[in-house]
Amino acid sequence: VSDDRPITVLHLVANRWWTGSAEPVIRLLLGLRARGHRVLLGLIPGDRFEQKAREAGLEPLADLSLEVRGNPVHALADLRRVRQAIRAEAVDVVHAHHSHDHWLGWLGRGRAGLVRSFHNARAARRDWPSTWLYRRTDALLAVSHEIEERLRRVGVPPARLSRVDGVVDLARFESGDGAAIRAEFALGHAPVLGCVARLAPRRGHELLIRGFQQLLPEYPHARLLLVGKGEARARLEALVSGLGLTREVLFAGYRDADLPAVLQALDAFALMGAGSDESCRAALEAMAAGRPVVGRRVGALPETVVHGVTGLLVDDDRPESVAQALRALVAEPERAAAMGRAGRDRARAFFGPDAHAAQVERVYRRVLAARERAR
């Protein structure tokens, strides 16, 4: 396959929500399209992901359900629809993002190449049907070294594995004004630390809160802004109340349209857990907004944050360690601002839609060249 011929790619995404793989997939499709490729999208219709895809100018395939727990009749109808689309649209590559659509893509691929993205380590399964499928997939993409190593351990040939960086909408997060957010929460000129993450178990909010608490004797005017919604909110609010921090720790709820402004209101960003998207997109958004990042060594954060340059990495789960990192940025605002600028430069260089799409495009061309040689 020539290096300049446009590629037609069918992305299958068994996701209905605006979480996990959803936004990275849309950013990738837009990046591929901007590079001259033709992109098709199959998704679960009727929910937030479809709404966001259409808002981005992407028209999902019709007559496709992708229901993970659908009945066999729906599954067979989906297989027929995928096969028909691959033939009618002359699809070169089928790119799956979840286990369900991975199997569907393998069964319906015909002569097209098959690529699978893994957005979190839990998706890399160890059971024999999954490992059998992985070894018969042309390329597997991991958004972190942790996922890459897990796939190696289950027997995926190294030649089929590729590590790809996360992706962020640079244009959206490089602009914004935090003044309205500071006014909304009466933050004034206080040093403000923030976290954008679902309020759920294993996201590290308790660790962050307890680390922040240790900062307050030296910096009593500091504030912690927790952005997000989720089932753990009541528990976290009870923790904050029990620690006597209801004035210092603020719950901002779920923010979407004004998220860039929220990030601009922060002096530093903190993320203690990776969630369902282990590229840690929230940290990438903070970097694009010019905020320094404090993060635990989870997901792709060790590859995203350059310790001492774009932020600080915490090596363990002790509140004392988190407090030390937060204190370093609050104590030296000029250093924190310089880290934020370096983070923005790094986001522009490596994590924009074009850079991400170029990485994936190289994988596609390698897959197609190998399949051409094998014919």
Say what each PLM segment does.
Residues 42, 292-295, 305:
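Short hydrophobic beta-strand element within catalytic cores of glycosyltransferases
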